[in-house]
């Protein structure tokens, strides 16, 4: 990943072991590749075999391994963690959105089960391994919040509620895990060029409105988010925990 390599030392996280949950596409894939670019040994997960196989086939794929994981499955998550020799970095990117359908309580619950409870499950089950991290400055967790952690989404009440929950979960676990030497932070991406936003990108009027409101005047690229994650996992962020970092070009403050 050229931009990451130009910004950070290639050995910044040398020897560190990282797990990127939901790391086979979009923002998660960029994060996995960025962590690998700075020396980490990375495993990424995807929800289905087809997602994992597609990730492996991309020219940019830099992780050591890609495995299937349903974040709702305790046993499956334990198996993934048991296969790792150690764990220094956990990044939680697994998430779903069902725009227009989330007012159905069943769909609402499905979204929370992945986005919020899944994030908690990953943090809780990885805690013991992160506690034993010999890396400097100790174990690090980065969760994925959203600009919808801070504002409502009429078509996505489940997604918005889940991301608001991730924000408060991050702050709560930062307090709870501090005595273990584990830092817990989150990123809150804005409008990012990923497959999930493809329809918006192709809608000239709506895309122009997004860019017009964004002070930095463009869509984010996945690499923009990945750079923030690398920083939060690095020694430069050794005294940062409980932070939720917007990566939105100023959208929320405009």
Residue ranges: model-predicted function:
Residues 2-9, 151, 230, 241-254:
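Short C-terminal tail/terminal secondary-structure segment
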Residues 24-25:
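Conserved glycine-rich cofactor-binding loop
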Residues 93-98, 250:
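Conserved NAD(P)H cofactor-binding loop of Rossmann-fold oxidoreductase domains
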Residues 99-112, 210:
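Substrate-binding pocket helix/loop in short-chain dehydrogenase/reductase
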Residues 123, 162, 170:
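Active-site helix of classical SDR
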Residues 146:
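Residue(s) in the substrate-gating loop at a strand-loop-helix junction
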Residues 178, 183, 240-242:
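Short, small/polar-rich loop/turn modules that mediate ligand/substrate recognition or access, typified
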């Amino acid at each position: 990943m050229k931009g990451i390599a130009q910004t950070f030392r290639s050995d910044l996280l040398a020897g560190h072991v990282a797990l990127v949950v939901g790391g086979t596409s979009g923002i998660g894939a960029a994060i996995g590749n960025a962590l690998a670019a700075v020396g980490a040994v990375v495993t990424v997960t995807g929800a289905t075999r087809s997602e994992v196989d597609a990730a492996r086939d991309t020219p940019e794929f830099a992780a050591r391994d890609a495995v299937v994981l349903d974040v709702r499955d305790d046993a499956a998550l334990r198996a993934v963690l048991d296969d790792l020799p150690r764990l220094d970095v956990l990044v939680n990117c697994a998430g779903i959105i069902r725009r227009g359908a989330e007012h159905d309580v069943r769909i609402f619950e499905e979204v929370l089960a992945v986005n919020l409870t899944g994030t908690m499950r990953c943090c809780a089950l990885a805690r013991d391994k992160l506690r034993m991290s010999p890396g400097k400055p100790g174990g690090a967790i980065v969760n994925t919040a959203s600009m919808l952690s801070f504002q409502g989404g009429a078509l996505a009440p489940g997604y918005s509620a889940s991301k608001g929950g991730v924000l408060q979960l991050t702050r709560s676990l930062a307090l709870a895990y501090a005595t273990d030497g584990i830092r817990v932070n989150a990123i809150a991406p804005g409008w990012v060029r990923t497959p999930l936003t493809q329809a918006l990108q192709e809608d000239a009027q709506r895309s122009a409105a997004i860019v017009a409101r964004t002070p930095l005047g463009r869509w984010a690229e996945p690499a923009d988010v990945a750079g923030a994650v690398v920083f939060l996992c690095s020694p430069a962020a050794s005294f940062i925990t409980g932070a939720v970092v917007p990566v939105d070009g100023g959208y929320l403050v405009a």
